[in-house]
Amino acid sequence: MRILGIDPGSRKCGYAIISHTSNKLSLITAGFINITTTRLQEQILDLIEALDCLLDRYEVHEVAIEDIFFAYNPKSVIKLAQFRGALSLKILERIGNFSEYTPLQVKKALTGNGKAAKEQVAFMVKRLLNITSEIKPLDISDAIAVAITHAQRLKLH
């Protein structure tokens, strides 16, 4: 089973596709979608086109998205919510459903501590998937962590 994990952001959207077979996890691909245009409509279109390319290239069975975190800048939250809405609609069209996890749930699933630092999550991602190279930026390790969290939840059910 292939799981797409997404860490949406207003400038970078981290993504990762992992394989979950026979209690074994392996990384298929990971990266980020760089949002460089300035107009909101173009940003949303670029994001959705990149997601379409990922879904066309890889046979994805499940999708997990990190939920919006609290932010002090209301404009950032609104923009992020618009991106998540566009992503959600595209995923519903292509896959049929998705799961959502809060940052606290992801951190707790990977480190056992819901208040863990991003670096601790990245360390556990590397350890669980036997990755020796550095994972940068942290949006990528966050997306991998979201996918791993979903794999763990599927295993429990």
Curated annotation (Swiss-Prot):
* Assigned GO CC terms: cytoplasm; Holliday junction resolvase complex
Q: Which residues bind Mg(2+) 2?
A: E66
Task: Name the coenzymes or cofactors required.
Answer: Mg(2+)
EC code: 3.1.21.10
The EC class name is hydrolase
A GO BP term, please?
DNA recombination
- Where primarily located? cytoplasm
- Where is it localised? Cytoplasm
Q: What is this protein called?
A: Crossover junction endodeoxyribonuclease RuvC
Gene name, per UniProt, is ruvC
